[in-house]
Curated annotation (Swiss-Prot):
EC number annotated for this UniProt entry: 2.7.1.24
Role summary: Catalyzes the phosphorylation of the 3'-hydroxyl group of dephosphocoenzyme A to form coenzyme A.
InterPro entries xrefs: Depp_CoAkinase, P-loop_NTPase
Keywords of this entry: ATP-binding, Coenzyme A biosynthesis, Cytoplasm, Kinase, Nucleotide-binding, Transferase
Protein name (database record): Dephospho-CoA kinase
Gene symbol of the encoding locus: coaE
Record keyword Nucleotide-binding present: yes
GO biological process: coenzyme A biosynthetic process
Cellular localisation: Cytoplasm
GO molecular function, one term: ATP binding
Pfam families noted in UniProt: CoaE (PF01121)
Binding site for ATP: 15-20
CDD domains in UniProt: DPCK
Pathway(s) it belongs to: Cofactor biosynthesis; coenzyme A biosynthesis; CoA from (R)-pantothenate: step 5/5
Length: 205
């Protein structure tokens, strides 16, 4: 892009450890973190009227606000509804992130996005870190972090996210995999190794 010193994208399925990895990189290596998930929440607020027209009043809570749990359950049970939501939210999220990059051109950036490839954010990145974990481990983590979430919803989320790492015609992009089937200390050590690889590569570029 001819802009920021270094832009790393980080992606992974739900409960893979993606968010923890992003925070480690942000805090330890001085990267400014952009959360696509948080921007997605903002889009729900900004596009409330349009979304209510499409999905109906059933996505609103008692305060007449869009309820993320209600809309999540709706779209994860209907692929057509999911595509409608993505067609509205993804271009806006992409443009918001691009704007943040322009506003922070002297800063190292990490873009934290589960749907990084679906939103086309790989176009903005120098490197992409993919955090992976086995499905049983993901489910076990979710049983602790989100005990109220329905197991059927978990299975549908994992099914939807199974191909989030694959995209044709990715060229000139350095993709780094981290397998996170263990604990936080192990994840930290893996990140240290991978970040050292990036630092060494950048040094000799």
């Amino acid at each position: 892009m001819g802009r920021n010193p270094l832009i790393i994208g980080i992606t992974g399925r739900i409960a893979s450890g993606k968010d923890a990895a992003s925070k480690i990189i942000s805090n330890k290596y001085g990267f400014y973190e952009i959360s696509a998930d948080k921007l997605g929440h903002l889009v729900l607020h900004e596009k409330k009227e349009e979304l209510v027209k499409i999905f109906g009043q059933k996505i609103l809570n008692t305060r007449n606000e869009i309820d993320r749990l209600l809309i999540r359950n709706l779209v994860f049970n209907d692929n057509k509804e999911l595509k409608k939501l993505e067609s509205i939210s993804h271009p806006i999220i992409f443009n918001k992130i691009k704007k943040i990059l322009i506003q922070n051109q002297s800063t190292k950036i990490i873009i934290n996005a589960a749907l990084l490839f679906k939103i086309n954010l790989e176009k903005l990145c120098d490197y992409i870190i993919v955090v992976k974990a086995k499905a049983p481990i993901i489910k076990n983590r979710l049983s602790y972090s989100m005990p109220s979430i329905d197991s059927n919803i978990i299975n549908k989320i994992l099914e939807i996210q199974k191909d989030i790492f694959f995209k044709k015609n990715i060229i000139n992009l350095k993709i780094i995999n981290i397998i996170n089937n263990k604990n936080y200390a192990y994840l930290e050590k893996e990140i240290e190794k991978k970040m050292q690889e990036i630092i060494n590569y950048e040094r000799f570029e």
